[in-house]
Amino acid sequence: MAMGLIRLLSIAFTLVLLSILPLHLSLADEITSIESVPDLQKLMYVAVDGFPCVRLLNLSGEIGCSNPGINKVVAPIIKLKDVKDLVQPHTILVTADEMEDFFTRVSTDLSFASKIGGVLVESGSNFQQKLKGFSPDKRFPQAQFSPYENVEYKWNSAASSIMWRNYNFPVYLLSESGISAVHEILSKKKMKHGTYTSDVAEFNMVMETTKAGTHNSEACLQEGTCLPLGGYSVWSSLPPISVSSSNNRKPVVLTVASMDTASFFRDKSFGADSPISGLVALLGAVDALSRVDGISNLKKQLVFLVLTGETWGYLGSRRFLHELDLHSDAVAGLSNTSIETVLEIGSVGKGLSGGINTFFAHKTRVSSVTNMTLDALKIAQDSLASKNIKILSADTANPGIPPSSLMAFMRKNPQTSAVVLEDFDTNFVNKFYHSHLDDLSNINSSSVVAAASVVARTLYILASDNKDTSNSALGSIHVNASFVEELLTCLLACEPGLSCNLVKDYISPTNTCPGNYAGVILGEPSSKPYLGYVGDVSRFLWNFLADKTSVQKGNTTSVCSKGVCSKTDEVCIKAESNKEGTCVVSTTRYVPAYSTRLKYNDGAWTILPQNSSDSMGMVDPVWTESNWDTLRVHVYTVQHSAYDNAVLVAGITVTTLAYIGILAAKSIITKALKQD
C-alpha cells in the first residue's frame, strides 16, 4: 500500500511538470549533431549575413546608423506590415519597396521612431521590377558644389534623401542567406504558439564615435575615433610623358571617370550605371587605343584620370586640381595650363533604347575648344554608322552640367572647356541612383561598349587633329566587347567578382565581392603609398593603365622582384600576381584623394581653417567614417520573463508538494510498520 502511494505521487508530479513545460520532441532531432558548446551556440544563435548602414560624420553632425549606446541591441522581430501599436522597441523587418516610406515616417514621427530597436531590410533583384524607382540621395546631389545658381533643379527624380539623415538605431541589409535565416526562424513562430517565446535580433553595431561622444568630424578626428573618407585616384598618359624634358610639351586631352559610388549600405554599393559604366567605358577605350600604331606621333597628349571620393564632396577631383597647383610628385609631368580640354564619361549604361544607343553631350560653356570636342563626338558617331549610336547635345534649357566631376573643374576655373557624356538629357534615367539596387542587372553591356567605341575614336580625333572619317587608323580602332563584358562582371558582381582572371592577372585582391564605396584613407597620404592601404580597385586600375599605356625600350623587359625598377621612367606592374613583376616605361601615378580642408601630421588628422580663396573648401562638409569593430547580427529565440517566472513558481510548488508528499508517505509507512 505504501509503495503504491509513492508511485501515484510520482506520476502526479510528472503530469504536473508535463502540463507546465511545453516540451517539443522535435528539438531532439535538431540537436543530434551537437558535440560541443560552439555547436550549441551555432544552433541557438544564428549569425545573419548582410551589409550594415554605418555612422558617417561631417563638420555639422552625423548621418547614417548606429546602436544608440555602447551595448548590443536585442529586440523582437516583427514585419512592418504587422506593426500596429508597439509598446516596446522592436526589430522591424522591412522590404525594399517599403524603405522610403518607412524611413520618411521615422524622421517625422518621433513616437514611432522611439519604438524602433533595429531594422532588417529584405531586398533582391525582384524588387527592381516592382519599384518604379528608389534613390536615397537628394534631388540635386552635392548641389553646394554647383557652378551655377539653380540648385533647386531636379536631376534625380527618384530622390528620397533618406541616406543623408541620422538614425539612432542599427539598420542591416540582409543577404540572400540572411533572408533565409530570418524567414526560417519566423516560420517556426506558429509552431511555437503558446510557448511564451519571442524571435529576436541582436545587433552588435556599436560605433566608436558613439562610445566617445564625438558627434562631428572635428571632434572625432581630435579624439581619433574616425577617419576621413577618401582613397587613391589614378592617372596615366598615353604615350608616357618624359618628366625630365619640359620641351615640346603637347596640349593635354584629359579623359575623366569615377570609381566610387554610395548607397544606404556601406558595402552594398555597386554603382553599376553611376559611375562604373563610365569607368568601364574609359578602360575599354584605353584598351582599344593601346593597340593603335603610331600613338606616339599624335599631336596632343592623351591623359586618363580615374577619381575616387567624388560622391563625398568631389574629393578626388578637388585634390587632383590642388596637387596641380602644388606641382607635387603625384602629378609630375602635368600642369593646369597644359590641359586643353576635358572629356568626362559619366553614366553610360542605360543608353540602349529601341535598338539605338543614345548619349547626350553636356558642355560646360560655349567655346571653340568645346565645339571641337562636340565635332569630334559627331565624327566618331558617323564613323560607327553600323553600330546604331547617336550623340545628341543636351537640352539648352538645362541649368548647366549635371552633377559630375566637371563641377570641381568649373568651380576651380570657370573658363574650363569640357564635355560630360551621359545616358540622360534633362534628368537621370537611372532610377536607382546611389542605391544598392544599381547593380549589374540595371545596365546593358552593349550600351557600355557603344560608349567606349565613341570615346576611343573621339579621343583619337582630338589627339590627331584629323577629322577625316575615312582615315584608316580611325577605322582600325575597335573596342573589345568581350573585354568590356568581363570587366563588368569583375567590378559589379560577386561571382567571379575581383577573383576574375582579368583582375588576378594584375593584383592579388583582398576581397572577392567588389565594393565601390570610397572607404577611408589610411596612413599618411602619398603618391607612392603603402599598397596595403590602397583599395583593390585602385591597385587594379594602376596596374592595368600602366600596362596598357606603357612602352618598352627595345625588345627587352626587366623584372622587379620588390616592386621597384632601376630607371626613373619605369614602373613595376603585376608584382602582386606574379613572384616577379615587370618593369615598363609608363607615366602612371596614384593621387591621394581626401578633403583639401584636412592635413595629416604626426600620425593624426587636423582640420585647416577656411580659406576664402578655396570656394569649394568653404562648403566642404569634410566627411569622416566612425571607427568600429566587427559588425554582427544574430537571430535567436528567447523565453518571456513571465514564462521564466511561471516556471520558477511551478518549480517551487512542485518541490513543496514533493516535500509534503514525502513527509506524508514517511508518516504512513512509519504507522504501517508499527502496526506490523
Curated annotation (Swiss-Prot):
**Extracellular side of membrane:** 29-644
Any idea where this protein resides?
Answer: Membrane
Source domain of life = Eukaryota
- Subunit record text: Probable component of the gamma-secretase complex, a complex composed of a presenilin homodimer, nicastrin, APH1 and PEN2.
The glycosylation sites are 58, 336, 371, 444, 480, 555, 611
Signal sequence, renumbered to the chain: 1-28
Keyword set, alphabetical order: Glycoprotein, Membrane, Notch signaling pathway, Signal, Transmembrane, Transmembrane helix
**Pfam families annotated for this entry?**
Ncstrn_small, Nicastrin
Protein name as catalogued? Nicastrin
Cytoplasmic topology ranges = 666-676
Q: Which CDD domains match?
A: M28_Nicastrin (cd03881)
Q: Main role?
A: Probable subunit of the gamma-secretase complex, an endoprotease complex that catalyzes the intramembrane cleavage of integral membrane proteins such as Notch.
Q: What organism does the record attribute this protein to?
A: Arabidopsis thaliana (Mouse-ear cress)
